Amino acid sequence: MLSILRNSVRLNSRALRVVPSAANTLTSVQASRRLLTSYSSFLQKETKDDKPKSILTDDMLFKAGVDVDEKGQGKNEETSGEGGEDKNEPSSKSEKSRRKRQTSTDIKREKYANWFYIFSLSALTGTAIYMARDWEPQESEELKKDIDNGYTLSLMYKRFKARFNSMFTYFQEPPFPDLLPPPPPPPYQRPLTLVITLEDFLVHSEWSQKHGWRTAKRPGADYFLGYLSQYYEIVLFSSNYMMYSDKIAEKLDPIHAFVSYNLFKEHCVYKDGVHIKDLSKLNRDLSKVIIIDTDPNSYKLQPENAIPMEPWNGEADDKLVRLIPFLEYLATQQTKDVRPILNSFEDKKNLAEEFDHRVKKLKDKFYGDHKSGGNWAMTALGLGNSLGGSTKFPLDLIHEEGQKNYLMFMKMIEEEKEKIRIQQEQMGGQTFTLKDYVEGNLPSPEEQMKIQLEKQKEVDALFEEEKKKKKIAESK
């Protein structure tokens, strides 16, 4: 292009030399000026259009994660600002190109997502149809209650709803329908069952930055459990999970002499956002069950069986010991139903104080009538004339007898503790490893029984020797 312009300039200059007239000279000069002006404007335009361009295309930038549309939009705004046209209009062209631009990975991802949605919808539909099927013989009667078989929409919905709700009852109900085994036969059976909580009644746990977690045992807890164990089947029902409360329960009764069974939060019924200790799950007659707890939610299903107590904060008190006379009276009177007696107290939280007040009145009446030869109180308590001419109040006689039995029982427990300690020392070395199991070196059940009997004889012999040594030491 430049060479053409140069040649044209040279030709014009030659023409000017050939024609010497002034008019022709002026015309040629004007033509040269116009030609130079157009040439300079062409050079300026070429300089503007000849800006440096990147070797990275829009596709390469898009794959790398660069937002090409924003960049292009910025350029469009700049161009529109310069030209003064289409300043506020969106770049529909760039949006369309963005929608169309998809990599192979995006196509695969969209394909898999569609298949996942189809599979999920099919699975949910199939599950719903399966759960709405007719009842099967092995399903529980409680689940099938008031819902018949059939494939009408209403019946299918009811069966689906019943089966769907039953899946959540697994987490709301206790692990077993009967939390306790059947009671022993009458000669060995305690007349009443006493369910007591652990936290803030027998023990109190608190945390401090200096000492961490510490657990305090309430004054009189050992006496409370030991004394009432001769009258009641004691069930320790903790409000905490087993992993936290099991060790504390073992410390309270290491040889299981006082507490018959331990239950924990896992055995509660979860209802309305709270854990409830449902006494109907204990496999016991509710007319013979008493629960002592500090949380009203724990006994909200059977409040008539409850003795509410204030939570213990760790300070020394005698409320456990003061509760014993009433519980002893209740167990020794051959009560058919404990609920009317419990509900006869206006304020159950102060039951011990109110019972002491009643006993005091009855005792004054008894001694007043005894002076005049009356014996109505003994008859009212079911003792008749079995106490002969004793002037002691019947409840005092019952307490004295219970105290004697308690001392004898505790003496036997101390001996049993020593025997259990010796047994644990002797049985500690009797273990079998995984290697013995793999190699088949385990003894047969008959051989294991013989080994245990021999060990038990050794334990009994060592225990008798320990008793003889103690007697000799005491005699000296």
Curated annotation (Swiss-Prot):
Similarity remark: Belongs to the TIM50 family.
Name this protein carries in UniProt: Mitochondrial import inner membrane translocase subunit TIM50
Domain remark in the UniProt entry: The mitochondrial intermembrane region is required for generation but not stabilization of the TIM23 complex. The FCP1 homology domain does not contain the canonical D-x-D-x-[TV] active site, suggesting that it probably does not display phosphatase activity.
Mitochondrial matrix-side segments: 44-114
GO biological process: intracellular protein transport; protein import into mitochondrial matrix; protein insertion into mitochondrial inner membrane; regulation of mitochondrial membrane permeability
One annotated GO molecular function: mitochondrion targeting sequence binding
Main location: mitochondrion
Comp. bias intervals (Basic and acidic residues): 67-95
Transmembrane segments: 115-131
GO cellular component, one term: mitochondrion
Region (Disordered): 67-105
Keyword Transit peptide recorded: yes
Keywords for this protein: Membrane, Mitochondrion, Mitochondrion inner membrane, Protein transport, Transit peptide, Translocation, Transmembrane, Transmembrane helix, Transport
Mitochondrial intermembrane side: 132-476
UniProt function note: Essential component of the TIM23 complex, a complex that mediates the translocation of transit peptide-containing proteins across the mitochondrial inner membrane. Required to direct preproteins in transit and direct them to the channel protein TIM23, and possibly facilitates transfer of the translocating proteins from the TOM complex to the TIM23 complex. Does not act as a structural subunit of the TIM23 complex but plays a dynamic role in protein import. Has no phosphatase activity.
Encoding gene per record: TIM50
Localization in the cell: Mitochondrion inner membrane
